[in-house]
């Protein structure tokens, strides 16, 4: 009987140990100051871009999210890539035929910043059905980093989530669930152009509160618990509680519309029948339970 050598080792990603010094108030204050320096323009569709419209951004953002999910990228890669894309479009007019090339390039650079083993140019070209060549992607990479003045370490909502969770008196198992759902909300917000005007800290805080409310975590009176959390996080990020609450409601509305859209894609006939019932019952007044979402 022949002896076979089998490699049973599983490739694990090397990570640094959690450092509590990185979660202190001094670091958070520095992050809140820095986040505005890498913010895109809110009005670039009207002032800069001639061919690209918000619906095109939505399409390429959804494609980028699917690529990141299929490649099991780190959670920070997609929001960071969208930050690069919005900042570039805030500075440089772009033909719509080159928007997918820009999206692939943004993922390429963000992956280098956040991944141990980054995405390759060849792999990203495959995801475009080889409509772009690796050489084009590398040329676009040089243009991107020059337009962004090599300021690539932008703040994303993910950078703030851990700070918020460390300050909240929740059980560790609850924090893990909140973190998972908040990260999903952050990715969802990055696909929607309405959230460009919100700083990353507010998107992160709104996602955490929306996750808590949807999961019914906290005290037995969940509404009171979320109300207190909203006021607490608004003090942490130094914003008006009403602004944070509005951001949270936007996130819940976006989730609801995304679920409705997904349902229509699965079963259009059933959706039409259910739409009439929903209008009569007025179900839009209650936020969607995030436990119904397959994350």
From Swiss-Prot:
Q: Which GO terms describe its molecular function?
A: cyclin-dependent protein serine/threonine kinase activator activity; cyclin-dependent protein serine/threonine kinase regulator activity; histone deacetylase binding; kinase activity; proline-rich region binding; protein kinase activity; protein kinase binding; protein serine/threonine kinase activator activity
Glycyl lysine isopeptide (Lys-Gly) (interchain with G-Cter in ubiquitin) cross-link, chain position(s)? 269
Q: Where in the cell is it found?
A: Nucleus; Cytoplasm; Nucleus membrane
Q: Which InterPro entries match?
A: Cyclin, Cyclin-like_dom, Cyclin-like_sf, Cyclin_C-dom, Cyclin_N, Cyclins_cyclin-box
Question: Which BP terms does GO give this entry?
Answer: cell division; cell population proliferation; DNA damage response; endoplasmic reticulum unfolded protein response; fat cell differentiation; G1/S transition of mitotic cell cycle; lactation; Leydig cell differentiation
A Pfam entry, by short name? Cyclin_N
Occurrences of domain Cyclin N-terminal (ranges):
28-152
* Tissue spec. comment: Expressed in the intestinal epithelium.
Q: Which GO terms describe its cellular component?
A: bicellular tight junction; cyclin D1-CDK4 complex; cyclin D1-CDK6 complex; cyclin-dependent protein kinase holoenzyme complex; cytoplasm; cytosol; nuclear membrane; nucleoplasm
Q: What's this protein's function?
A: Regulatory component of the cyclin D1-CDK4 (DC) complex that phosphorylates and inhibits members of the retinoblastoma (RB) protein family including RB1 and regulates the cell-cycle during G(1)/S transition. Phosphorylation of RB1 allows dissociation of the transcription factor E2F from the RB/E2F complex and the subsequent transcription of E2F target genes which are responsible for the progression through the G(1) phase. Hypophosphorylates RB1 in early G(1) phase. Cyclin D-CDK4 complexes are major integrators of various mitogenenic and antimitogenic signals.
The family line of this record is: Belongs to the cyclin family. Cyclin D subfamily.
Q: What is this protein called?
A: G1/S-specific cyclin-D1
Gene that this polypeptide is encoded by = Ccnd1
